Amino acid sequence: MTRNTFRNALVAVLMVLLLGLPVFAAEHQHGDEVNDPCLGTTDKSDLEKVYPTKPPYSPYAGRNFPTRPFFGDTHLHTAFSMDAGAFGARLTPRDAYRFARGEEITSNTGQPVKLSRPLDFLVVADHSDGMGFFPLLMSGDPTLLATPQGRKWYDLIKSGKGADAAIDIIISFGRGQMPNGYPAPGTRVYRSAWQETIKAAEAYNDPGRFTAFIGYEWTSNTGGNNLHRNVIFRENGDKAGRVEPFTTLKPLGSDNPEDLWKWMAAAEEKTGSEVLAIAHNGNLSNGLMFPTIEAFGKKVDRNYAETRAKWERLYEVTQTKGTGEAHPYLSPNDEFANFELWDKGNLDGSVAKKKEMLEFEYARSAFKNGLVLEAKLGVNPYKFGLIGSSDSHTGLAAMEEDNFFGKTAPQEPSPERMTKAFFKNPKTGITVMDWEVSASGYAAVWAMENTRESIFDAMQRRETYATTGSRMFVRFFGGWDFEPKDADNRLPAAIGYGKGVPMGGDLRQAPAGKAPSFLVAALKDPIGANLDRIQIIKGWVDAKGEVHEKVYDVVWGDAGKRKPDGKTGKLPPVGSTVDVANATWTNTIGDPELITVWKDPEFDPKQRAFYYARVLEIPTPRWTAYDAKRFGTKPLPGTTMTLQERAYTSPIWYTP
């Protein structure tokens, strides 16, 4: 080989490697055939096969979008939470992760328990206030037992009245009346509990298989009004461990969410880890969760809206203490709004509910009011995605109707749990029965992979949906060019991402003459019930600043047998196969999957709007029916025995 030939060949190879293009030696630049002693003989057509310009044959090659949802729980308490421990929880964060990963363990009441299928991720979110308090109390700490409260709680627990102690602890905490010796950030006991929380997450985090997030619950509960947030770290323990959680009790903490957001900003700067906050149980806030005029004595202004929108990208819309999507008083034309409601009062039952509070407690009304605030302030503070989670205080994320292990240890399976009171406020008489506790819910996240970073990033972009316990798959896309034939494709996600935006996304100024169209699809839980219907809920604000909503049935099961009523437009019920006495049902009604393209028939391009999907399963037995069958317990009058499990997607917003 001559020196020039070798040099030209080397240049050609380097150009191919660096540019990815076929480059020919100078002496052959005017022809298609290459005949070189070093490279061999080939021609342009052969090289084009190596460097194709056409789409790949494999439809799965080069995908850059999520292909499956990951199911998990962002809100689980263990014995490290002071109220959970007082209620009888003995399971630790490590036990919680083992259970979520699919292991069989022993419950707080000595019963074997295992999930039907492992979860994909879990956040142990023990209360930041008093972390480590219960082990300290049970050890007989002299400082705590020297106080009347500490002695009272210790004696109650030791005498088998832990539930009474737990309720008294919650009430005292809500009043800011905790005893001396109470663990606070900076103390040895507190630091030890937080570090063990981090170590447990690090030990059970298994990228690609199971994600164990580091987090905690900030529990603002002043006056019994629930303003709780779960705080989650994106990064690992080496960063999260550089700070200790923010608490609510002064002087180190605050019950004002704006102070939590300030702490989050400082924590990100100090740790190098992103953090997010997820609010929950607006239904127990007595009108304080979604303010429109003022919050904590300050006006709801642009700064409030920007800050809340930055830190609170998600809202926990369903859990054991009820579902907070909608309320019949606010949505009288929605026949599915009356679902698993807790609407008697605030968290501790100290103040009864008034109807004027409801508007500021539920997600759908927050979405509507957010549109009004955006028009006024330029920012929507309530532009959040939706998830579900458990808020279980047992260490068990067991939110399955036939495998429900309650909210607290006393509500683990027993013949008595369905007929007992969950709590009763002696002053107001407000009572919530155990049967009213919901076996709900889970968070579904469309992430690229099962890692802390990927799931966190999907949460930040709001590509999430809530379920009440089912593991159905739900897709929801919005755009301007979806066509009915798109629903016939067996790979709808490729079309959805190609033509539009997914759940949690935004649509901007409408093209002339076009209305938004939506591609929505659902696939039943593999071991669950068939699907009744998919609905799209629209909310909008008109030129007068008044808000409106409408529920559309867009596709449904048994379509050949059911048609909307010609006058009301309502779809007839799907029916029911539930045998309550035997806690059984069959998939002989409904459909295993539903998909359609729907275009807004009443679109006004000048009006701000949001759209989200609600997917309903056919009726199935509630956990109370399983208890009645297995234990032979006679339900109390009014006990709900069946339900329609459901999913709520994050909205897609339209902004003109």
Predicted regions, residues:
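N-terminal secretory signal peptides that target proteins for export/translocation
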Residues: 1-7
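Short, solvent-exposed helix-helix connector turns and helix-capping sites enriched
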Residues: 161-162, 253-256, 393, 451
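Cap/lid and interdomain-hinge subdomains that line or gate substrate/regulatory clefts
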Residues: 185-193, 237, 248-278
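C-terminal functional module detector
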Residues: 26-154, 183-186, 196-208, 213-227, ...
